[in-house]
């Protein structure tokens, strides 16, 4: 899929005595200007008497953090009142639960229904920057946990300080793409740009030891295609 100008794949699976079909092909959906991308695909034909030998093999190198993730239990914690959270994790440690990677879920960034991504300022109701710095130091330095924040660059709320309609992906009929509730889907290129821009600011302020990136691997590439004809890679699932 990453060597294709197509918008999405399609499948037709069929099995009968004289015929078997699996998968299908690709679709080239018109962009916002009504044009389609030039056809570009790469095909591999493999023959083998063993089924597993014809399956795609993608590079999957060992994570440099395997020594941490492989020896710890991960907990995505629904951050609430910080004093209550401190007491909770202090009690967990007293019971011997020490090898834990803990990440705040999106409620670390928000108090109510406001934006929870594309942010460098934590929820005011949880103490803002000072509250987050204090909590990060307590979780890591006092309790010894691996601890960090939530993030994603797939859900973008109109109340966010960086909001602009040109940040959002477009559907083929030039409408803003929807994402999680109260959010729109950022252009894929903006995810790369804003992660590089905001993550260093967050880390400089709070000195985390881990982070949780949500959603990106849960949404198929062809479900977040940007059809905005003005941008490079428009209409392609590879972009």
Question: Would you name each region that the model predicts?
Answer:
Residues 1, 99-239:
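Aromatic- and carboxylate-enriched substrate-binding clefts and catalytic-loop regions
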Residues 1-114, 120-126, 138, 142-147, ...:
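Carbohydrate-recognition beta-sandwich/jelly-roll modules
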């Amino acid at each position: 899929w990453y060597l294709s100008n197509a918008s999405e794949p399609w499948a037709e699976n069929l099995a009968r005595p004289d015929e078997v079909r699996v998968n299908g092909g690709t679709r080239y959906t018109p962009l916002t200007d009504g044009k389609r991308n030039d056809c570009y695909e790469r095909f591999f034909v493999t023959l083998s008497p063993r089924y597993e030998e014809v399956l795609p093999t993608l590079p999957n190198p060992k994570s440099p953090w395997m020594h941490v993730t492989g020896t710890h239990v991960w907990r995505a914690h629904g951050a609430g009142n910080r004093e209550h959270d401190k007491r909770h994790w202090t009690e967990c440690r007293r019971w011997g639960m020490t090898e834990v990677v803990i990440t705040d879920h999106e409620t670390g960034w928000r108090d109510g229904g406001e934006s929870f991504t594309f942010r460098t300022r934590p929820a005011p109701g949880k103490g803002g920057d000072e509250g987050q710095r204090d909590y990060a130091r307590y979780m890591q330095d006092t309790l010894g946990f691996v601890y960090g924040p939530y993030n994603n660059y797939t859900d973008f709320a109109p109340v966010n300080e960086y909001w602009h309609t040109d940040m959002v992906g477009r559907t083929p009929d030039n409408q803003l793409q929807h994402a999680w509730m109260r959010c729109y889907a950022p252009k894929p290129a903006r995810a790369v740009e804003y992660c590089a821009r905001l993550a260093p600011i967050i880390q400089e302020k709070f000195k985390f030891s881990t982070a949780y990136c949500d959603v990106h691997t849960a949404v198929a590439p062809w479900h977040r295609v940007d059809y905005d004809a003005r941008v490079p890679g428009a209409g392609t699932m590879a972009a």
